[in-house]
C-alpha cells in the first residue's frame, strides 16, 4: 500500500507502533495530513482519533458493517463467496466509525488448498485495500463527507463478530477432512490451529502433541484418503508433511509449531514421538496438478511448454527442497518435447530464498546455511544452463534469493501486484544466487548497488521500468497466468524457438561460464564469513522467533 501511494506522489512515512505513546508522539511531532492504519492490531489512542485536524483512518479487512479482530478468519470459516475491505474513521467504538469507502471482492480459488488467511491478505485483500484507500483519499480531496454506519440499510451485511478463541481453532479429528482443512486455513499463517494426534491404539499422545499449532493443510483427494486408521492418527509422510486420518477422508499438514519455532511437520520426528516414529513414506511421481500434497509438480501443454510449480510454504527453500527441485528441472531438461520451461514458483510467493527456520533448527546452523545457499545456487545454475527457453513467472512476491533466481531465466515476468525485495542487507548477508552477475547485467552496476544497499521493496511495475523484469501484467493470478501462457506458446513456435536456443548456446559458452562461476565463488567467500558472524545468527533468530 505504501509503495502504491508513493508511486502516486504522496509523501509517505511508515512507522511500526508498539506503544500508544509512540503514536501520540508521532502525530504531534510529524503533523501529517492523514494517519492511515492498515489492518490494525492495537487500539488507537483517543488523543489521536479525536484530533479533528488530522483524519485517522482504519483499513478494516471486512465488508461494510463487519466489526472485530477476526474478520478474515470468520469469513473463511463461514465460507463466504464475497468479502471486502472498508476504510473508516477511527472512533471510540471499534470499527464503528464513519465510512470513507468500501471495496468488495469475490473469493474464488481454483485450488482450495491455497485459500489461507495469509494468502487472502496478500492477494485479494491487499488489492481491494489499495483501491479503497485511493478512493477514500479522492473523496477527502474533493470534500466528500464519509457516511455513518447504518445497520438498518439492507445492503449492510456485516455484523460485530467476537474474536476467535483457542476453542474455535482446536481441531476435532472426528470431523470431515474438508472442515478440518478449512479450520487450519483460516488460522494460517497466524496463529495456527491447535491439534492433538492419536496413536494407532486410539489414545491421545498429549505428551508430544500438546503444544503444537498446525499449518499448511492440503486435502487428500486420491486413494490415500481411504487408508485405514482412527481419526487423529498419522498415516504417512511425504516431503516434510504428515497425512492425518479424519472422521471422513484425510488431510495433510505441512508444518507444526512449538515454542515459537515453525518447522516442516516431519522434522518433529526427531523428538522420538511414539505416534509417528515408524510412519511410512508415501512417494509420488511428478506430473499434472496433484490431488494430494505435492509441493513440486509439472504440467505440459501440447505445444511443448512445461510449467514447473514449486509451491514451498512461505517461499522458503530448504536444502532438501532445492535438491528435489533440481531433480525435476533435470527431468524437464531431458524431455525433448519440451521447448519452453516456465518457472511458476508458488501461488503467493515465487521464492524467498534459503529456509531460515530449518537452518535455525539445525544442529550446526552455520553448516546448514552453507549447504542451503549452495543448493539454491545449484538451482540457479540449472536454470541458467538450460537448453530450453526459460521464463520465470512471479505470480506472488519474492525475497532476495527468489528475485535473483528469477533473473537467471531468459525472461522474467511478474504480476502487477507483486512486491520484490532484491536485497540481503536486513539478514546481515552479502548474498549469492549469482546476483553479482545477473543483477548488474539487467540493471547496470549503479542501479544494482542502489537496490542492494537501499534494502527497500519495489513494485513489479517499477522493477520492469528499471529493467529488473521484462514485463508485468495482470490484476489477478488468472489473468497473469493466461498472459504468460500466451507468451510461452509464442516462444515455443519452431522458428523463434530455434533462434533463442542458438542465442542461449552462445550465452553459456566456456568463457561466459568461467565468469559466472567466478561470481559464485566470490559471493560464497563473503557468505562463508557471514555464516560465522554473530550478527547473522542474531538476525536469523529475530526473524524466526518474531
Residue ranges and their predicted role:
Residues 6-30, 34-62:
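Internal alpha/beta domain cores that form substrate/cofactor-binding pockets in large enzymes
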Residues 38-160:
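Donor/substrate-binding cores of folate-linked one-carbon enzymes
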Residues 136, 430, 467-538:
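C-terminal long alpha-helix characteristic of the crotonase
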Residues 168-294:
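An anion-binding loop in the catalytic cleft
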Residues 261-344:
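Conserved CoA-thioester-binding segment of acyl-CoA-metabolizing enzymes
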Residues 303-308, 321-367, 378-391, 415-419:
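A structural preference for short, pocket-lining loop segments at secondary-structure junctions
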Residues 343, 355, 405-407, 463, ...:
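Hydrophobic/aromatic residues within transmembrane alpha-helices
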Residues 385-387, 391-400, 408-495:
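Crotonase-fold acyl-CoA enzyme core
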Amino acid at each position: 500500500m505504501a509503495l502504491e501511494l508513493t508511486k502516486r506522489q504522496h509523501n509517505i512515512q511508515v512507522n511500526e507502533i508498539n506503544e500508544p505513546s509512540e503514536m501520540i508522539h508521532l502525530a504531534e511531532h510529524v503533523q501529517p495530513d492523514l494517519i492511515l492504519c492498515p489492518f490494525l492490531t492495537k487500539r488507537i489512542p483517543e488523543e489521536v482519533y479525536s484530533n479533528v485536524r488530522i483524519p485517522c483512518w482504519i483499513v478494516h479487512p471486512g465488508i461494510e458493517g463487519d466489526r472485530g479482530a477476526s474478520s478474515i478468519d470468520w469469513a473463511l470459516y463461514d465460507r463466504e463467496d464475497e468479502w471486502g475491505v472498508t476504510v473508516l474513521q477511527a472512533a471510540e467504538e471499534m470499527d464503528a466509525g464513519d465510512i470513507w469507502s468500501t471495496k468488495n471482492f469475490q473469493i474464488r480459488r481454483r485450488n482450495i488448498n491455497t485459500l489461507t488467511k495469509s494468502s487472502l491478505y496478500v492477494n485479494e485483500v491487499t488489492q481491494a485495500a489499495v483501491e479503497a484507500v485511493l478512493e477514500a483519499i479522492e473523496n477527502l480531496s474533493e470534500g466528500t463527507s464519509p457516511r455513518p454506519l447504518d445497520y438498518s440499510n439492507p445492503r449492510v451485511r456485516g455484523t460485530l463478530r467476537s474474536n476467535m478463541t483457542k476453542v474455535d481453532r482446536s481441531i476435532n479429528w472426528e470431523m470431515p477432512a474438508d472442515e478440518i482443512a478449512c479450520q487450519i486455513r483460516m488460522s494460517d499463517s497466524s496463529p495456527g490451529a491447535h491439534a492433538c494426534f492419536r496413536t494407532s491404539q486410539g489414545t491421545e499422545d498429549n505428551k508430544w502433541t500438546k503444544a503444537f499449532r498446525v499449518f499448511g493443510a492440503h486435502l487428500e483427494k486420491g486413494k490415500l484418503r481411504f487408508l485405514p486408521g482412527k481419526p487423529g492418527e498419522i498415516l504417512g509422510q511425504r516431503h516434510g508433511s504428515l497425512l492425518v486420518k479424519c472422521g471422513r477422508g484425510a488431510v495433510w499438514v505441512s508444518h507444526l509449531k512449538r515454542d515459537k519455532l515453525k518447522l516442516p511437520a516431519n522434522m518433529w520426528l526427531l523428538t522420538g514421538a511414539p505416534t509417528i516414529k515408524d510412519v511410512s513414506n508415501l512417494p509420488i511421481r511428478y506430473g499434472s496438478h496433484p490431488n494430494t500434497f505435492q509441493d513440486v509438480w509439472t504440467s505440459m501443454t501440447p505445444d511443448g511448454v512445461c510449467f514447473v510449480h514449486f509451491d514451498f510454504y512461505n517461499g522458503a527453500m530448504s536444502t532438501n527442497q532445492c535438491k528435489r527441485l533440481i531433480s525435476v528441472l533435470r527431468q524437464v531438461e531431458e524431455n525433448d518435447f519440451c521447448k519452453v520451461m516456465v518457472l511458476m514458483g508458488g501461488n503467493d510467493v515465487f521464492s524467498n530464498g534459503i529456509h531460515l527456520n530449518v537452518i535455525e533448527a539445525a544442529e550446526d546452523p552455520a553448516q546448514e546455511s552453507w549447504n542451503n545457499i549452495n543448493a539454491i545456487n545449484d538451482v540457479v545454475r540449472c536454470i541458467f544452463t538450460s537448453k530450453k527457453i526459460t521464463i520465470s513467472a512471479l505470480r506472488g512476491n519474492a525475497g532476495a534469493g527468489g528475485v535473483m533466481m528469477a533473473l537467471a531465466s531468459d525472461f522474467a515476468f511478474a504480476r502487477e501486484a507483486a512486491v520484490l525485495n532484491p536485497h540481503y542487507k536486513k539478514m546481515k548477508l552479502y548474498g549469492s544466487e549469482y546476483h553479482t552477475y545477473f543483477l548488474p547485467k539487467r540493471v547496470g552496476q549503479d542501479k544494482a548497488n542502489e537496490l542492494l544497499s537501499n534494502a527497500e521493496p519495489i513494485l513489479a511495475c517499477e522493477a520492469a521500468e528499471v529493467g529488473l523484469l521484462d514485463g508485468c501484467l495482470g490484476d489477478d493470478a488468472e489473468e497473469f497466468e493466461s498472459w504468460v501462457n500466451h507468451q510461452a506458446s509464442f516462444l515455443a513456435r519452431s522458428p523463434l524457438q530455434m533462434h533463442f536456443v542458438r542465442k542461449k548456446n552462445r550465452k553459456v559458452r566456456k568463457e561466459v561460464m568461467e565468469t559466472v562461476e567466478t561470481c559464485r565463488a566470490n559471493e560464497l567467500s563473503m557468505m562463508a564469513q557471514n555464516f560465522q558472524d554473530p550478527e547473522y545468527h542474531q538476525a536469523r533468530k529475530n526473524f524466526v522467533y518474531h
